[in-house]
Amino acid sequence: DLQHNGELLLSKDFRGSEIESLSIVISGDTSEMAPGITSLDGCDLLIHEATFLDDFSQHADDYLHSTASGAARTAIACGAKHLVLTHYGARIKQTDESLSEAKSVLAESKTTLSAARDGDRILIENPNEITHLYWRNDGWIR
């Protein structure tokens, strides 16, 4: 609140309607279960690298990167509502295997999953409605 020219101006008279807050965590080049992420008490959206598949989990450990399943375990540990996999290594040509490995870890959780490629968009309508958009020949597809 503010006093101006003898008039009390109330801050509530100048604010719009309240909006629901949203927490987004973006993690690139990060090992599985990084303390800065797993110490969170929930987040709406975790965007996490998935450089390797499980066959190369030792490489992930050696180079401080994650596998898709490691990103999923991290999502569960930090209480993420939605996980977006990204930042794939050169060996990964399609995201199907990454999705499959992450889905197997997330099977018993409520965390939803998608795999983003370069140029994709993540549309956040509210904390409970996160949509992955990707471009195909004639426009954006959900």
Predicted regions: what is each one?
Residues T51, Y88, D118:
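Short, ordered loop/turn segments at secondary-structure junctions
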Residues T95-G119:
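Short, electropositive alpha-helical surface patch
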Residues M33, I92, I122:
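Flexible, glycine-rich phosphate/dinucleotide-binding loops
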Residues D1-L85, S98-E101, N128-R142:
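Metal-dependent phosphodiesterase/nuclease catalytic metal-binding core
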Residues G119-I124, I130:
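A short acidic, often aromatic-flanked loop/helix-cap motif at beta-alpha or helix-coil junctions
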Residues H65, I92-K93:
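An N-terminally biased module of ancient metal coordination in phosphate/nucleic-acid-related enzymes
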Residues L85-R91:
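G-domain G4 guanine-recognition motif of GTPases
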